[in-house]
Design a protein with these regions (language model features):
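Bacterial N-terminal signal peptides that target proteins for export
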Residues: 1-9
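Bacterial N-terminal signal peptides
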Residues: 8-19
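Short, charged, low-hydrophobicity "junction" segments
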Residues: 18, 23-26, 99-106
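C-terminal/domain-edge helix-coil "capping" segments
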Residues: 23-50, 109, 120-124, 139-220
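N-terminal segment of the mature soluble domain
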Residues: 48-51, 58-123, 129
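Solvent-exposed loop/turn segments at secondary-structure junctions
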Residues: 56-59, 93-96, 135-140, 168-173
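Hydrophobic beta-sheet segments that form the core/acyl-binding groove
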Residues: 132
């Protein structure tokens, strides 16, 4: 009887573990990540995040997303924000707004001029923008692991606020699913980082208030 219960418990644990693995989108995971907050005050103030044009030279292996697929993949990544903590605006939407307001079609400019116009105008539409840089080597067989960098900049000062990097497993299949899951990982971690920054600020404010009250009592 005891042995039977142990087997049932082991099966439940196995099934639960399998469910969690698939819930992440990929059984093998999306790799290792690291993140850094450069400006916690700026991070707290972000309510609208714009998805800027990505830096990507195109697929180097079969099944990898095309350049034109990346904007949709990044926007699909925002779906992880089920509580709508942030507002998101796509690159094309920003370009359309600039075209209407400034009569400048960014989509027709070369990458350098387009980025300059984007930086000069993005502050009208968002609090921050994220630039995604994809480093995928020359082929899947060249030994290079997929590296994806997400750098978030203040839309008004263009100073970096937050950086996130994902290093995919060497054996990972570089398809749209992997890229989408990596995007979801970024947005999820970004939201968590903002939440943590808010909590830290609240604790700091309470500590300062407590100290001020203690100093006021001593002064009486």
């Amino acid at each position: 009887m005891k042995r039977g219960l142990q087997l049932v418990l082991m099966l439940c644990v196995f099934l639960l573990g399998t469910q969690v693995s698939f819930a992440g989108g990929l059984l093998g995971g999306t790799g290792v990540s690291d993140a850094r907050v450069y400006d916690s005050e700026g991070l707290i103030k972000i309510q609208t995040l714009a998805i800027a044009d990505s830096i990507y030279n195109g697929p180097t292996s079969e099944g990898e997303p095309e350049i034109d697929d990346i904007p949709e993949i990044l926007m699909n990544g925002t779906l992880v924000d089920k509580k709508n903590v942030l507002n998101y605006i796509s690159y094309r939407e920003v370009c359309q707004n600039i075209k209407i307001a400034r009569h400048i079609d960014i989509l027709r400019l070369d990458s350098r001029k387009a980025f300059k116009e984007y930086k000069n105008n993005i502050g009208l539409y968002a609090d921050a923008y994220v630039i995604t840089t994809i480093s995928n080597g020359t082929s899947m067989n060249d030994g290079t692991r997929l590296n994806v960098f997400f750098d978030v900049y203040n839309a008004r000062t263009n100073k970096i606020v937050y950086a996130y990097r994902k290093l995919a497993p060497k054996s990972a299949v570089r398809d749209s699913l992997l890229y989408t899951e990596i995007a979801k990982d970024f947005f999820s971690d970004f939201i968590d980082a903002q939440k943590q920054a808010i909590e830290d600020k609240e604790k700091e404010d309470k500590a300062i208030l407590k100290l001020e009250k203690e100093e006021a009592k001593k002064a009486k």
